[in-house]
Design a protein with these regions (language model features):
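Structural recognition of the beta-strand scaffold that forms the well-ordered cores
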Residues: 31-32, 75, 93-97, 120-124, ...
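Acidic/histidine-rich catalytic neighborhood of metal-dependent amide-processing enzymes
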Residues: 101-102, 106-108, 112, 188, ...
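A conserved hydrophobic secondary-structure block that centers on an alpha-helix together
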Residues: 81-133
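Loop/turn elements at helix/coil->beta-strand transitions in domains of secreted/extracellular proteins
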Residues: 25-29, 89-94, 116-121, 168-170, ...
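Sec/Tat-exported extracytoplasmic proteins
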Residues: 1-6, 18, 23-29, 98, ...
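Solvent-exposed loop/turn segments at secondary-structure junctions
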Residues: 4-6, 36-39, 80-81, 99-103, ...
């Protein structure tokens, strides 16, 4: 299912690959620049009901025990406080509908479920994101604590599980998520097209961490940035000022227990790794969702 999250093995492997590509292009001063982040290593997730495996994907939330957790599934509509009236979900897995564009982020129903005593969350994106098909899954930054295991499930599968609710439905959820606080390193990859002067610079960039396969967000941007760099080098063009091609890590997510958990790689770059870029940088041409 992909996933190249902040500080993960996959993100580090991609960083090494991008360093090689920038060197092959012929950029100068190619560097893999370390920045601090929380680490999210997603290894696996599964959901099984009556011997049937359902396709699921995780958020940057807690793991289950290695053997998984088995509990009754309770449908709670949108998972608001009012939706729990007359329900006891203590020790149970809640199934809920969510529209993260028009209502609220996954953080809120996850925290409410935890407050109500639930041990896990299954969230079906009925609006907003993941609308390309009724089996589409979603992942977002969590903007809060790791909480309890929280999985995205397709709308069609959610409806199927709800139909099973004529009787008690028991599910086994397994989530292997390593979310480690202050224990991660992300890398920002830079290469320079030298200008006539290095007193100032222009940044051209995007981010290379992704949810799933990341075609649109943001692998297309990575390809665009590298293609621009390659074309400029091959043309023999020399700009007036340095052009720094910068590919950031830890953009989608990079920190727990905060609502400011995204763009961590870029924030670390300008605040801690290269604070001297403030005042030196004329422009940052950032590519996001360019497809």
């Amino acid at each position: 299912q992909g996933g190249r999250n902040a500080g993960s093995d996959a993100e580090h492997a991609a960083a090494d690959y991008l360093v090689g590509v920038m060197k092959d292009i012929g950029l100068a001063d190619v560097e893999k620049q370390a920045a601090q982040c929380d680490r999210w290593q997603f290894n696996s997730a599964s959901l099984t009901i009556d011997g049937k495996d359902y396709n699921v994907y995780t958020y940057a939330t807690a793991s289950t025990p290695a053997e998984g957790l088995t509990a009754e599934v309770v449908y709670v509509n949108k998972g608001t406080r009012q939706d729990y009236e007359d329900l006891d979900v203590t020790g149970k897995i809640v199934l809920l509908d969510i529209d993260q564009r028009n209502d609220w982020w996954i953080t809120y129903p996850m925290l409410e479920a935890m407050h109500q005593g639930a041990v896990g969350v299954l969230a079906a994106n009925v609006g907003g994101f993941a609308q390309i098909a009724d089996d589409a899954l979603n992942s977002q930054d969590i903007c809060g604590p790791v909480g309890i295991p929280t999985l995205s499930i397709g709308v069609a599968d959610s409806k199927e599980i709800q139909k099973l609710k004529a009787g008690s439905v028991s599910a086994t959820m397994k989530v292997d998520n390593e979310v480690e606080i202050d224990a991660g390193t992300t890398y920002n990859i830079t290469g320079v097209l030298k200008g006539k002067s290095s007193d100032h610079q222009i940044l051209v960039g995007g981010h290379y961490d992704v949810h799933f396969q990341g075609f649109q967000d943001d692998n297309c941007a990575v390809g665009l940035v590298l293609a621009m760099a390659n074309a400029m080098v091959k043309s023999g063009y020399q700009p007036e000022n340095d052009i720094v091609f910068c590919l950031h890590g830890a953009e989608e997510w990079g920190s727990s227990y905060t609502q400011y958990d995204w763009t961590v790689g870029a924030w670390e770059m300008i605040n801690h790794v290269h604070p001297e870029w403030v005042g030196k940088t004329l422009a940052f041409i950032n590519f996001e969702l360019p497809a």
